[in-house]
Swiss-Prot record:
Protein name, per record: Tetraacyldisaccharide 4'-kinase
Key word Nucleus present: no
Catalysed reactions, semicolon-separated: a lipid A disaccharide + ATP = a lipid IVA + ADP + H(+)
Disulfide bond residue pairs: none
Protein's organism: Salmonella typhi
Length: 325
């Protein structure tokens, strides 16, 4: 229902317009207060790159963060990552991730980024506190913040927006009548707009999510996902249909698709109940970090990597690298 409202297919969005105007007024006032200097943002002693969204819901932001971290690491840059840690609850903040940190403590996306990149990752509702925790423990040269475009309390040097190329901005209205956290005109002020799927417009960077080999959660064995039989597909991400479509494009045709809420807590019994005799469970990598501790032999995940096209990605990386002292 929310998807139909936000796309404009359902007329119910009109009933939510008063709340949207209020949301837009408050969010605009917050941004203006920082722009005018009425509120002061904290500036880190190293450059800060924000990777965020203009809309609610999954746009492919985490793969972009991983891509950016890995590309900078390849250039010899020491990178740290901060996040709010949505979906997790730590005993105390800021929380600096270790190999023992669970998704229940830090959230699924920070744990995924930490496991994939090996970069220092810290989470805290106040992102400045997370930055300070990383700087106190690691000699990093640059900070990437996973989400936080609207978190103006942390000053930033580069802003990158990730856009769902199929859904774009829906009906264009602020939450809750539409998907917008900020209006589309905000794109004029960011340093780069990366478009996940669909067709990128002039000045935007095209991106595709390229699937790799399926990985067994228990053994680490790898195989072509199309070789797996009797698949039950599970996706607890912002836009589950994207994952199911990826499986189909890989030649894997699930018998059943189970969409879950983004960041949903997964209990062992609930996940086990999804898979019947002779079936194979295939999930996203973000779900896998939550399920690895209680995984069965027939559970697999399909990793995806961001692939950015054209000359703009290299120019963006050169610009970011030039900020490192």
């Amino acid at each position: 229902m929310i998807a139909r409202i936000w796309s404009g297919e359902s007329p119910l969005w009109r009933l939510l317009l008063p709340l949207s105007w209020l949301y837009g007024l408050v969010s605009g006032a917050i941004r203006l207060s920082y722009k005018l200097g009425l509120k002061r943002a904290w500036r880190a002693p190293v450059p800060v790159v924000v990777v965020g969204n203009l809309t609610a819901g999954g746009n492919g932001k985490t793969p972009v963060v991983i891509w950016l971290v890995e590309k900078l690491q390849q250039r010899g840059v020491r990178v740290g990552v901060v996040s709010r840690g949505y979906g997790g609850k730590a005993a105390a903040y800021p929380l600096l991730l270790t190999p023992e940190t669970t998704t229940a403590e830090a959230g699924d996306e920070p744990v995924l980024i930490y496991q994939r990149t090996g970069a220092p990752v810290a989470v805290a509702p106040e992102r400045a506190a997370a930055v300070k925790a990383i700087l106190a423990a690691h000699n990093v040269q640059i900070i990437i913040t996973d989400d936080g475009l609207q978190h103006y309390r942390l000053a930033r040097d580069i802003e990158i927006v990730v856009i769902d190329g199929v859904r774009r901005f829906g009906n264009g209205w602020w939450l809750p009548a539409g998907p917008m956290r900020e209006r589309a005109s905000r794109l004029k002020t960011v340093d780069a707009a990366i478009v996940n799927g669909g067709v990128a417009r002039a000045g935007e960077i095209p991106m595709q999510l390229a699937p790799g080999l399926a990985v067994n959660l228990r053994t680490g064995a790898r195989c072509d996902v199309a070789q797996l039989s009797n698949i039950v597909a599970m996706a607890g991400i912002g836009h589950p249909p994207r994952f199911f479509a990826t499986l189909e494009a890989c030649g894997a045709h699930p018998q059943k698709c189970v969409p879950l809420a983004d960041h949903q807590t997964l209990a062992p019994a609930d996940v086990q109940a999804l898979v019947g005799e002779g079936q194979t469970l295939v999930m996203t990598e973000k779900d896998a970090v939550k399920c690895r501790a209680f995984a069965e032999d027939n559970w697999w995940f399909l990793p995806v990597d961001a692939r950015l096209s054209g000359e703009q990605p290299d120019k963006l990386l050169e610009h970011i690298t030039s900020l490192v002292r």
